[in-house]
């Protein structure tokens, strides 16, 4: 694991919406010595949030200098690429059981849950992230991804 401070990064934009998008965009001079560390799928950390680089684009700026633009998604987006989930039926279950199933085999675990509603429903989602979004929709509350501790939490709104 290589750690480096990207002190020459600029135009840094972090978009983080509750129950929504979470991504990071920034630029760095192409000639920056740390530019070579920035490859697709590498992890980045900004404060306590962890992101995975999805695109690295090199373009000429208006001044003629080459600039590297980075787009990275929060680490939890990896859950969209989890192993395929099979159809599941839940009878009067709290959110914990379907969340545990959704996270099985992903390296993520269930964190604190303050939503105590019981629901009966059938899951037809194909990956962990879409299943977690469905769980949030069915049980209510706010879904939070703790990218540092690799946990998914759901809080009462």
Predicted regions and their residues:
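Short beta-strand-centered interaction patches in the first periplasmic/extracellular domains
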Residues: 57-79, 112-157
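Juxtamembrane "anchor/assembly" segments of surface/extracellular structural proteins
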Residues: 1-37, 73-77, 141
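Short, solvent-exposed secondary-structure boundary motifs
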Residues: 1-7, 42-47, 129-137
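Residue-level signal for tight coil/turn positions that link beta-strands
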Residues: 21, 48, 147-149
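Surface-exposed cap/loop segments at beta↔alpha junctions
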Residues: 29-114
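Generic structural detector for well-ordered beta-strands
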Residues: 13, 27, 52, 71, ...
